[in-house]
Amino acid sequence: MDYKETLLMPKTDFPMRGGLPNKEPQIQEKWDAEDQYHKALEKNKGNETFILHDGPPYANGNLHMGHALNKILKDFIVRYKTMQGFYAPYVPGWDTHGLPIEQALTKKGVDRKKMSTAEFREKCKEFALEQIELQKKDFRRLGVRGDFNDPYITLKPEYEAAQIRIFGEMADKGLIYKGKKPVYWSPSSESSLAEAEIEYHDKRSASIYVAFNVKDDKGVVDADAKFIIWTTTPWTIPSNVAITVHPELKYGQYNVNGEKYIIAEALSDAVAEALDWDKASIKLEKEYTGKELEYVVAQHPFLDRESLVINGDHVTTDAGTGCVHTAPGHGEDDYIVGQKYELPVISPIDDKGVFTEEGGQFEGMFYDKANKAVTDLLTEKGALLKLDFITHSYPHDWRTKKPVIFRATPQWFASISKVRQDILDAIENTNFKVNWGKTRIYNMVRDRGEWVISRQRVWGVPLPVFYAENGEIIMTKETVNHVADLFAEHGSNIWFEREAKDLLPEGFTHPGSPNGTFTKETDIMDVWFDSGSSHRGVLETRPELSFPADMYLEGSDQYRGWFNSSITTSVATRGVSPYKFLLSHGFVMDGEGKKMSKSLGNVIVPDQVVKQKGADIARLWVSSTDYLADVRISDEILKQTSDVYRKIRNTLRFMLGNINDFNPDTDSIPESELLEVDRYLLNRLREFTASTINNYENFDYLNIYQEVQNFINVELSNFYLDYGKDILYIEQRDSHIRRSMQTVLYQILVDMTKLLAPILVHTAEEVWSHTPHVKEESVHLADMPKVVEVDQALLDKWRTFMNLRDDVNRALETARNEKVIGKSLEAKVTIASNDKFNASEFLTSFDALHQLFIVSQVKVVDKLDDQATAYEHGDIVIEHADGEKCERCWNYSEDLGAVDELTHLCPRCQQVVKSLV
């Protein structure tokens, strides 16, 4: 007989190496074959629901790490809630309309001019659906579970119909109206442009300083004072209606050779230099805050028009005078601030960039040519203080490479002002993980202007608006609902396939159309209105979901995006927020915190991580991040994540190997009869479980990541599993001491696998499939471990022991360095009380100390002589163990004997081997 044959060594088919890139797809195929998503729902049918509503990613392009971070975080939550017994359906969605898809088709060589609008839209739809299939495959490869066979898609007829109904209800409440707003306009293309169609090039522009006389001082400034503005677009001066100052900036009234000028104090030196003022002749006469200057009235330099002094937070001290020329018809900030003061929107420029009749003496001039005419007139009026030329970065049309302008054109708006307070109240009633999230969306809603919902494109949901012969707008409940019904049946392409009269209810008449002819709106809706309608198109429409959702979770850019548009349309139509709880995550940066870009060569994409390391590594990385802020990823970070994964995997494998001959139904030891050390570990498991459950509840995955490592390293690897080898391998198979440990080991393995399951979805499933006697076919169909009250007194006692054990380990390390011993089993440890700790009394209640310390002999005495080393928990002496080494267990003994041909066996091993002979 060989010694090895008498040992109970670990046995498991669970491989040491993960091989995740190859193994994970096999596990996923099994899940799909078993329809695990619906099985999990069926298991919890009738239970309390939890709805995490998916914000739809855009259906264009490959997934980036931000997509992975987002979907994996959502998967953590939904899987955890499912394992807690909630009915938690997860319906992924896609946003499919908008300019990028139009651009993508153009890049692919699709010539829009050679086909009808309806045909072009059909190609857009085909492209979007192709992109969805690609992204869907990649999301599933990350281990994300959801109803991917029936996702929601914003181009589906039923979704578009729901969106139209929201529009109609808002229109019914007077929240939809038509007005003018400045947009990027390309005179060379004669069309409006989206930001994505803008590129920046250097341009030489006039730089002018202009004086505006005070007309009504409001008792604040001197009546003969002048405001100085600076602009690089002289052609917009005819559209000036205001001067904007920052409410919190300090402004000064400066006397310069008898002239009184008002500018920001922080810019006074720069202005003096630009205008060649003699510094000796400059005198600061008065000081104001921008707030105090509000509502002072200035006079337009050459038109019979007032220019109101107003407040705006967009004013900076980076350049200029701190007094900003404001023309709401030609600037985004100007328009937004102008809305607050109900300023007129003047934009006397036509589609070709030429001044209209409204431009007065500049009529017929191309805007760029008008620059000289305007500066000449300002000089004539004595208002031009300085003309110069600068070269600066300026927006150009990406197609024609020609400069663009801001030009006010008719647009459709959703009124924010009428529902702003209701939205703010809804935000107050919404829960947030962090207060700054609430502050962020609250301030955005509080400060935002009206919502421009129209776009001059073709790939989107048409605005369901008609016009009578006399130009009157037709947007009634009857007409809008009829369009919604048509879209539900045929899709929105019908708008581009039929005449206006065929889109109106049968027999529809209107006093503005005596001849019965109508036209239809050509603009489409902003894509944020599309995705912002998902609470109606998805939550209220799908039977397994419900409104409002329990949770929305997206990137922090969605405070101004989807979070904002969703709560706006929901409050406007339903009076409540569409989400009860809001959570956001940061962006994914490289290892140094820099933005990823191809030019820097620092881009890491999900596909690369999955193919090289596996989805579970990507998921473990997500759990390791403080996702509320921006997170970092690099090859080095992923290597560290892989190292942590390896440690987790090997620990689970060790436990699997050592419960291979254990049946919990027949071999378990009742808790009251467990060895105390096993009861300690059982209570530590309960403590770890309670903490992990609490962290899942609070979405604190970084805590889980850290505590899993701590539990594995400190409690298991450094102590329990190391201590356990002498029992699991050496003791008799059915001995009480071995079964006691296996009882707890099995519990740790099962509970840890469950607790890790939402994060390491594939590995947990693999462990489960190798765990004997588990009841559920999949760990993902099991329930989370229950939180059980711990025996605090026992934990406190053993924590003290573990501190004492640390002292013993330190003493062993010293003895090893001094060549007193080699391995710890060569040691004999003597422990005595000292002034700091009564070790001899404390240790009386502990059995098998030599096993707990992993040494051969332990002696506890009241006192030791001066040769002992004093530690926090007693005086300790390390000597070489007495006797000789047992050839089977490697413990030292003075009573070695033989059984059959096996010699050098300690008494314990003699007894075990005899039972095998």
UniProtKB/Swiss-Prot annotation:
UniProt cross-references to InterPro entries, sorted A to Z: aa-tRNA-synth_I_CS, aa-tRNA-synth_Ia, Anticodon_Ile_BEm, Ile-tRNA-ligase, Ile-tRNA-ligase_type1, Ile-tRNA_ligase, M/V/L/I-tRNA-synth_anticd-bd, Rossmann-like_a/b/a_fold
Keyword Ubl conjugation attached: no
Ligand binding (Zn(2+)): C886, C889, C906, C909
GO cellular component: cytosol
Entries under Gene3D superfamilies matching the protein: 1.10.730.20, HUPs, Ile-tRNA synthetase CP2 domain-like
Documented EC number(s): 6.1.1.5
Reaction catalyzed: tRNA(Ile) + L-isoleucine + ATP = L-isoleucyl-tRNA(Ile) + AMP + diphosphate
Main subcellular localisation: cytoplasm
GO biological process: isoleucyl-tRNA aminoacylation
Motif ('HIGH' region): 57-67
Keywords for this protein: Aminoacyl-tRNA synthetase, ATP-binding, Cytoplasm, Ligase, Metal-binding, Nucleotide-binding, Protein biosynthesis, Zinc
Compartments in which it is found: Cytoplasm
GO function terms (MF aspect): aminoacyl-tRNA deacylase activity; ATP binding; isoleucine-tRNA ligase activity; tRNA binding; zinc ion binding
Superkingdom assignment: Bacteria
Entry's cofactor comment: Binds 1 zinc ion per subunit.
Motif ('KMSKS' region): 595-599
Binding site for tRNA(Ile): R632, Q640
List of residues binding ATP: K598
Pfam families given in the database record: Anticodon_1, tRNA-synt_1, zf-FPG_IleRS
PANTHER family reported in the protein's UniProt record: ISOLEUCINE--TRNA LIGASE, MITOCHONDRIAL, SOLEUCYL-TRNA SYNTHETASE
Function: Catalyzes the attachment of isoleucine to tRNA(Ile). As IleRS can inadvertently accommodate and process structurally similar amino acids such as valine, to avoid such errors it has two additional distinct tRNA(Ile)-dependent editing activities. One activity is designated as 'pretransfer' editing and involves the hydrolysis of activated Val-AMP. The other activity is designated 'posttransfer' editing and involves deacylation of mischarged Val-tRNA(Ile).
Entry-linked HAMAP family: Ile_tRNA_synth_type1
Quaternary structure and partners: Monomer.
Family: Belongs to the class-I aminoacyl-tRNA synthetase family. IleS type 1 subfamily.
The name this protein goes by in its record: Isoleucine--tRNA ligase
Organism (species): Staphylococcus aureus
